[in-house]
Amino acid sequence: MKLNKLNPRWDAYDRRDSFWLQLLCLKYLGLWPPEDTDQATRNRYIAYGWALRIMFLHLYALTQALYFKDVKDINDIANALFVLMTQVTLIYKLEKFNYNIARIQACLRKLNCTLYHPKQREEFSPVLQSMSGVFWLMIFLMFVAIFTIIMWVMSPAFDNERRLPVPAWFPVDYHHSDIVYGVLFLYQTIGIVMSATYNFSTDTMFSGLMLHINGQIVRLGSMVKKLGHDVPPERQLVATDAEWKEMRKRIDHHSKVYGTMYAKVTECVLFHKDILSFGDEVQDIFQGSIFAQVCASVIIICMTLLQATGDDVTMADLLGCGFYLLVMTSQVFIFCYVGNEISYTTDKFTEFVGFSNYFKFDKRTSQAMIFFLQMTLKDVHIKVGSVLKVTLNLHTFLQIMKLSYSYLAVLQSMESE
């Protein structure tokens, strides 16, 4: 993939390439073990990843937690909690990501399977749109995070007394030593950068895979609409995998026994079943971490707004809170948006069937089509959480924002009293 002025030219047959920026970040952060190497090399890499996380994430979060021993009022709590909640949630998300890394790598390999290759001209558009969506999603979150970091690092310069970018407690006094202050300032800056990179690299893995699933659903819709119509022959694929060969063998058998049209309906049924299975796997891998992010975002957004509305807020603090708020709301909105898109696209299958030339179907093919239609009538919702289920859609996003504002109003009333 050639990158020219942030204008990538995608290869629709290499859909994994849309994650190249995420994989680059995860590789250097110790969260993407080499896939084609011996176990000893993987173990050394895993140890490297643990060392980074302990130094710049776990200890970093511990210094923020210890800050609570000096809090005096609600403003101090908000000042400490809005970043600490992000760190605690991130630690949980990364351990879940690290635990499921083999399954995540398998999902990215599955993304490049022959079944998901576009076969007709109309099928290229949804695949390429999904790839662009994954890339620009990463770019957007990365740039917003960069601006947030810049504001946080600059904000201490606007204060009369010496302070660090993030509220934290250290066993040394940095107020009277330039060297100690410089070392701690650098440590926090590295921690902020790494935490932000961890966040947008792992979160966009889930949303990116879901965008690709949505693109494949749209692809399936175009296949359904062409049933019964005269279409050009499928593009011949030079390289195919074992899964595709086995599926083609089954489809060719149906074509010889029951006819070409019945075989095409069978292909749509098998494709639909595979997409749903892939979606269930992605959902099962990430449901715990996404649920934690959604729940924590209510408190984080509330505390960020409370800090931004304080009396002694500088312009740099206000801009930092604004960009941080944009990052947090964007994370949750993206999760809810991709879930909403998948539900919306799957609900349109009845419409797709209506565009097919079903008048040409024989009795057996019509029965197969009815069976397929019954399969697609089942509602598809992306849900996260184990005991308490949260459906990812735009309604959920609005509820999160309303809940955050309600908590903010309660805290502001307590502060005024």
Swiss-Prot record:
Domain of life of the organism encoding this protein = Eukaryota
Query: Could you mention a single GO BP entry for this protein?
Result: olfactory behavior
Q: Does the keyword Glycoprotein apply?
A: yes
According to the UniProt entry, its GO molecular function terms are: odorant binding; olfactory receptor activity
Membrane-spanning residues where? Answer: 3-23, 46-66, 74-94, 134-154, 179-199, 285-305, 318-338
Cytoplasmic topological domain residue ranges: 1-2, 67-73, 155-178, 306-317
Keywords from the UniProt entry? Cell membrane, Glycoprotein, Membrane, Olfaction, Receptor, Sensory transduction, Transducer, Transmembrane, Transmembrane helix
- Give the disulfide map: none
**Is this entry keyworded Transmembrane helix?**
yes
Glycosylation-annotated residues = 112
Q: Extracellular topology: which positions?
A: 24-45, 95-133, 200-284, 339-417
Give tissue specificity per the record: Female-specific antennae and maxillary palp expression.
**Quick one: where is this thing mainly located?**
membrane
The job of this chain, per UniProt, is described as: Odorant receptor which plays a critical role in the anthropophilic host-seeking behavior; establishes the host preference to transmit malaria. May participate in the phenomenon of decreased host-seeking behavior in disease vector mosquitoes after blood feeding.
Name of the protein in question: Odorant receptor Or1
